[in-house]
């Protein structure tokens, strides 16, 4: 349902806002609506990718070795899947994500 909502936002809602803004002479506003629509499209893509991972049971298990990081305490595990429980802080598997250096 979330992906469908994002689809509606970028294909219909913000495009209609942009058209109305253009018709009323607000070209800069129309451009901003289209920029927001592009963001909403990316949101849809992310939701659909997550859904594929959930359906394939690949959220916490990967075919390749990954570095998993506990979002609570920062504990690192290297392997194909996240542990059931963090050995450091005892938080459940749901707290683990594939580590990404984004700095």
Regions found by a protein language model. Give the residues of each.
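Non-heme di-metal
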Residues: 1-103
């Amino acid at each position: 349902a979330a992906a469908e909502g994002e689809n509606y936002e970028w294909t219909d809602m913000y495009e209609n806002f942009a058209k109305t803004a253009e018709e009323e002479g607000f070209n800069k506003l129309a451009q901003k609506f289209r920029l927001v629509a592009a963001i909403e499209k990316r949101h849809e893509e992310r939701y659909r990718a997550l859904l594929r991972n959930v359906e394939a049971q690949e959220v916490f298990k990967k075919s390749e070795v990954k570095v998993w990081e506990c979002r609570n305490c920062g504990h690192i595990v290297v392997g194909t899947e996240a542990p059931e429980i963090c050995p450091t802080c005892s938080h459940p598997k749901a707290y683990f994500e594939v580590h990404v250096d984004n700095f």
